[in-house]
C-alpha cells in the first residue's frame, strides 16, 4: 500500500500565489516538477479560472499526476520534459502562446521514487542500481559505480554528497568491483556501512545516505538542470509573475538562493523571501520528509514589462 501523498509547503505556496493574484483571474501556472500532482491540484482548486502547464521528466510521474487531476483535464496541458528544457518554443509547440504567471519547482525526490519505483533510489530494498529519473535514458548508478575512476568517484561523493569518507569509500568500491560488479542497492549500502565505523554514523541516518544522494545527483545531473532551468524559467515568467522554488538539501538551496538573489539585484525582479520559508511544526509532524524543505520566492516586477514586450515583438 502506498503512503499518503503530501504537497510539501502546499499552504505556504498557495498563500503566496493568492497574495499576488486575484482568485478569479485566469492565471496560467507552470508546475515544472509535477510529481503526484498535489501542488497543481491546489492551484486548480484555489484559482477556478486558472490553467496549469504540467511538466515532469518522468513519464510515470506525469501519468500519475494526470490521473489525480482527471477532474480538471480541460484546464491542464501536460508536457513530458525536464523543467530546464522549458522555453517559449516548447510551449508554443503544445499550443501555449502565453507566458506563465506562476511557476513552481519542487526539487525534492518523490516518495513514489524512493519506495515504489524499483529504480534503486533507496537502500531499504534490494533493487537494481539505476536511479534515473527519466527511465532508460542515459547512464545509471550501476554504470557510475562500476566504471568511474577512483578519483572521479571520490569527487562526486565529496562534491555532491559532502561525504568526508569519500576517498576511503571510492578506494573500497574500486577494489571490490574487480571481483564482482556492484549491481544492487543492498550491496552498495552494506559495503558503505562496513567502511564507516558505527560510532561515526550520522544520528538517525543510514551511513550510505550521502553516497546515494551523490549518485542520484550525478546520474540525473540535477544541479546543472537547476541552474539552467532557473535562467530559462525566469526569462519565460510574465511580468508581475511569481516563481517559487522548494529545495531539500544545501547544494540545491545554495544554487537557488544565489540565483534568485542575483536576479533580485537586476532591475525587474524582487526577492519576496529574504530568508527561506520553512514548513510549520504541524506539517513536519504530519509529514517528517518536509522538515528540510526550504521555500524561496522571486517576483518579476512590472518594470520588466517593457523588456517583455520588446522581446515578444522580436519573436513575432
From Swiss-Prot:
Tell me where the transmembrane regions lie: none
Instruction: Name the UniProt key words of this record, in alphabetical order.
Output: Cytoplasm, Methyltransferase, rRNA processing, S-adenosyl-L-methionine, Transferase
Q: Which reaction does it catalyse?
A: cytidine(1402) in 16S rRNA + S-adenosyl-L-methionine = N(4)-methylcytidine(1402) in 16S rRNA + S-adenosyl-L-homocysteine + H(+)
Query: From its record, what is one biological process in GO terms?
Result: rRNA base methylation
Q: What EC number(s) are associated with this protein in UniProt?
A: 2.1.1.199
A cellular-component GO term for this protein: cytoplasm
Specify the enzyme's EC class, one word.
Answer: transferase
Looking at the record's lineage, which domain of life comes first?
Bacteria
- Intracellular or extracellular location(s): Cytoplasm
Q: What residues bind S-adenosyl-L-methionine, as annotated? A: 37-39, 56, 83, 106, 113
Q: Name one Pfam family in it.
A: Methyltransf_5
Gene3D superfamilies per UniProt: Putative methyltransferase TM0872, insert domain (1.10.150.170), Vaccinia Virus protein VP39 (3.40.50.150)
**Basic and acidic residues bias locations:** 302-316
Task: Write one Gene Ontology MF term.
Answer: rRNA (cytosine-N4-)-methyltransferase activity
Q: Where is this region: Disordered?
A: 276-316
What family is this?
Belongs to the methyltransferase superfamily. RsmH family.
Concerning HAMAP family, the annotation shows: 16SrRNA_methyltr_H (MF_01007)
The function of this protein is: Specifically methylates the N4 position of cytidine in position 1402 (C1402) of 16S rRNA.
State the protein's name: Ribosomal RNA small subunit methyltransferase H
Species in which this protein is naturally found: Leptospira borgpetersenii serovar Hardjo-bovis (strain L550)
Query: Upper lineage ranks?
Result: Bacteria, Pseudomonadati, Spirochaetota, Spirochaetia, Leptospirales
- From the UniProt record, report the name of the gene that encodes this protein: rsmH
